[in-house]
């Protein structure tokens, strides 16, 4: 990071053009974004990497932003530039990256920019054999501000977004996160509390393994760690998103009760880079019964076990397993599928939540500090509940991937990936797809 004071803002463009490329710092972990924040700060901001004297305020500002940097699935690198006020009472950073993905589907396609196995056509035809895709809509911008206050200590304000807000290829801006964090509280929009950000490996595919749950929610969350960072827990109230099949006997109405996800995590290792986590979520979904002319509700619930384990210096493992009823927002492949609940096939005046489960496991090996390989398998299944509502209802999806990432320069990387997926319906219809992805990404 190359910090500046507010008074130096007019010289920012000149500094950007004149700044030399720093040597890539050595890693202490096989995870591409898994460095200890304090160690990474010391390595990348030592006097040897600086061309000018830095004040204590600037050092403190960089440390604040390093310590609050979040690592994990689809997270950005630490910012290159940090702006600080006098005595570091307030600082902010700007950053992001430009990402270009190219994909080619053959032997079956996915009707989505991302590799979503739910969207694999079951009855293939001449239009579902091959497809070319070029996409830069996941390029990202972010702003982080940190205030060091006497009353409540450190306050973090964060916003980020990409260009996936409209139809495919429209490049409409989309807000990902917008929250303020203080005293263990997070208020705003962020990744759902049910998601374990470090339980999935890096993928070129923006969607990631189909049993994972990288979704966002508007929330109020409380988190706390203790026992020297070995133990942590979190609980939240999140705005519910219901996706059900109502049939002829029911109708949608506004929701009244937030989803309640919570977790307990145990971490180990010198930098706490390995952990296991147990999570759960409870939901209460409201709908209107047209037959009885009254409102009713269904209870959804889910449990998850997840984690990441650094087995040795170059090898890291990832996994998560989830089971529940009526939890489509918390399983990647089922989000928006209409399977939180469906009418009973024998009596459409009755309705029930759908049981569902999924799991994924992956490994990542760092061949050098700049080069790593990943591979894994993921599957999702929707169980029958007294039969099935429709013959073309989703039953099972499989997601297999292998990739290679190479860091050309500290903020530039390229990657290649192969993906195989399949979808099976309740009535045994099946489709499959193959995709080759390549990516070029440059951060700033």
Describe every region a protein language model picked out:
Residues 406-408, 432-444:
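Outer-membrane beta-barrel "beta-signal"
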Residues 105, 148, 162-168, 194-196, ...:
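Sequence/structural signature of outer-membrane beta-barrel proteins
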Residues 21-108:
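N-terminal periplasmic/intermembrane-space "pro-region" immediately following the signal or transit peptide
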Residues 139-159, 263-290, 366, 371-378, ...:
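Surface-exposed extracellular loop regions of Gram-negative outer-membrane beta-barrel proteins
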Residues 271-387, 391-394:
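Detector for outer-membrane/organellar transmembrane beta-barrel domains
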Residues 83-114, 125-243, 256-257, 261, ...:
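Outer membrane beta-barrel
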Residues 10-19:
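Bacterial N-terminal signal peptides
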